[in-house]
Design a protein with these regions (language model features):
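A glycine-rich beta-to-alpha transition motif near the start of alpha/beta enzyme domains, typified by
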Residues: 4-120, 152-285
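Active-site glycine-rich loop that binds ribose-phosphate moieties when present
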Residues: 126-139, 167-170
């Protein structure tokens, strides 16, 4: 069943989650299929809607033998690439919906299959393997794709807290070679004990977010690839990454050809749930 606004209003049940400050509206779309990018944009509006960095739809995926399919749309309402923190929230939401009673879940997203694990209030998901030949190291930045494209800038002397992430990120986002497709821009500071601080400008949100899961993973891999952390270490466990929204941990295995066994772990919280009555007049605001 596809929801179409043919009446004065419709009722939409929703769940608001956050993963290290990256917040999302989650919708159970297994029976009622919701496909309306303008609606999604309105729902994500922090002044006239519920407010969120993006929308996550949980859909049936029986054909591909996974527990569910995760469809992700940015706050601009458009379907986007993989969202790491969104994936962690989707795993927690799927458990709440009763899709599984176990603390392990198998799901599919735009970039392929993922496994998710729930341990108390922490949720971990495995991420795609990264072919080291696809990582582009330039004199001033590193580019790689961890399910979403990321531009990594390492800060040496600069104070990351004073960085104007919005202005600088926006300027890089559409620059050559990215143009209209854009890129996520990460500013990274290496601290003691191989700890990272990361701030991210996200395309589609068109602003800095409190945390970006794929950006955190990309930052750790870029730091490993440029030998800024864990030089000559094969199995890398629980690299701590500090974001504005909290702490995340990244683990991975580094081989000659690729980074594999990549996992992203952090907190997930159901903030609230409710129902919104969507009036046609509201959509036309």
């Amino acid at each position: 069943m596809k929801i179409i606004l043919t009446s004065l209003y419709m009722k939409l049940d929703f769940y608001k989650y956050q993963g290290t400050g990256n917040d999302f509206i989650l919708l159970d779309s297994r029976k009622k299929k919701v496909e309306n990018s303008f609606l999604f944009k309105k729902l994500c509006d922090r002044h006239f809607g519920i407010g969120a960095d993006g929308i996550i739809l949980i859909q049936n995926d029986d054909k591909y033998k996974s527990d569910f399919y995760m469809k992700y749309c940015n706050s601009d309402g458009k379907e986007s690439t993989m969202c790491g923190n969104g994936g962690r929230c989707a795993v927690s939401f799927a458990k709440k919906l009763g899709i599984t009673k176990k603390n392990k879940i198998h799901f599919r997203a735009i970039d392929g299959y993922h496994n998710g694990f729930i341990i108390d209030n922490l949720v971990s998901i495995n991420m795609m393997n990264i072919d080291r030949n696809t990582i582009k190291i330039h004199s001033k930045y590193v580019f790689l794709n961890t399910g979403s494209p990321h531009h990594i800038l390492f800060l040496e002397e600069e104070n990351i807290k004073e960085k104007n992430v919005y202005e600088e990120g926006k300027n890089i986002r559409f620059q050559n070679p990215y143009f209209e497709k854009g890129v996520n821009v990460n500013f990274v500071k290496i601290l003691e004990n191989d700890t990272l601080q990361v701030r991210t400008y996200e395309r589609g949100v068109e602003n800095e977010t409190l945390s970006c899961g794929t950006g955190v993973v990309a930052s750790v891999i870029a730091a490993c690839e440029t030998n800024k952390i864990k030089n000559n270490v094969k199995d890398i466990k629980d690299i701590l990454v500090q974001t504005l929204g909290g702490k995340l941990w990244v683990s991975l295995t580094k081989t000659k050809k690729e980074y594999k066994n990549v996992s992203l772990t952090g907190n997930v919280q159901l903030i609230f749930e409710g129902s919104i009555f969507i009036d046609k007049d509201w959509l036309n605001l």
